């Protein structure tokens, strides 16, 4: 999408390791586009917005990404990527009608560490206070530890495990549809 995507250092569209393009959370036009979709969804009656892949790329030639829109803010701790993601979540929160739940999906490693482990800018400690719920693919065994990590980052943010990872092989009589 013209004027909204991540660029490489040569000024061309950045393709990650999966040959996918990414919107640049540092660009106002990209954030406005996503907020318009979210606003339309809530106008149609959706009561929860679950945002997935709210990060910068973590695969491909990461050193070739033009991160000029993700420079660390003066007098702020951490990475400008995290600051951009947090700013985006604050903007989304501002356009949501009263009573609409804002949720974010993170991976279990990010939740356990509390910080961006994959250089994508996701940091539980920065993002959890801005949303109502954190979702994560998890096994039943790791659910309580992940829930505790989310609570430690924000006492107002809930945790919802996506029990998609089987702790043990399913019996042959079970059918798993994904």
Features from the language model and the residues they span:
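Extracytoplasmic/secreted cell-surface and envelope-processing proteins
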Residues: 1, 58-61, 111-115, 143-146
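Aromatic- and acidic-residue-enriched segments that line the glycan-binding/catalytic groove
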Residues: 1-15, 57-73
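Aromatic-lined carbohydrate-recognition surfaces of secreted/lumenal glycan-active proteins
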Residues: 50-53, 76-120, 155-167
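Active-site-adjacent "subsite" loops/lids of carbohydrate-active enzymes
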Residues: 1-39
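Generic structural signal for well-ordered alpha-helices
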Residues: 38-39, 82-93, 121-124, 143-151
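Soluble non-cytosolic domains of exported or imported proteins
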Residues: 24-32, 79-86, 144
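Active-site groove signature of glycoside hydrolases
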Residues: 25-26, 34-63
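Substrate-binding cleft of secreted/luminal carbohydrate-active enzymes
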Residues: 125, 130-178
């Amino acid at each position: 999408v013209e004027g909204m995507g991540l660029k490489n250092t040569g000024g061309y569209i950045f393709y990650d390791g999966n040959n996918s393009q990414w919107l640049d959370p540092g660009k106002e036009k990209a954030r406005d586009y996503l907020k318009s979709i979210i606003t339309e969804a809530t106008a149609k009656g959706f009561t929860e917005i679950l945002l997935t892949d709210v990060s910068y790329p973590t695969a491909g030639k990461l050193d070739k990404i033009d991160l000029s829109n993700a420079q660390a803010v003066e007098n702020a701790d951490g990475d400008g990527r995290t600051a951009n993601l947090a700013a985006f979540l604050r903007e989304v929160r501002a356009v949501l009608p009263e009573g609409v739940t804002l949720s974010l999906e993170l991976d279990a490693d990010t939740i356990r560490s509390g910080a961006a482990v994959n250089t994508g800018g996701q940091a539980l400690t920065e993002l959890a206070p801005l949303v109502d719920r954190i979702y994560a693919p998890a096994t039943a065994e790791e659910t309580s530890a992940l829930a505790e990590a989310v609570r430690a980052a924000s006492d107002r943010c809930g945790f919802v495990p996506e029990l998609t990872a089987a702790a043990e092989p399913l019996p042959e009589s079970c059918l798993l549809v994904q």
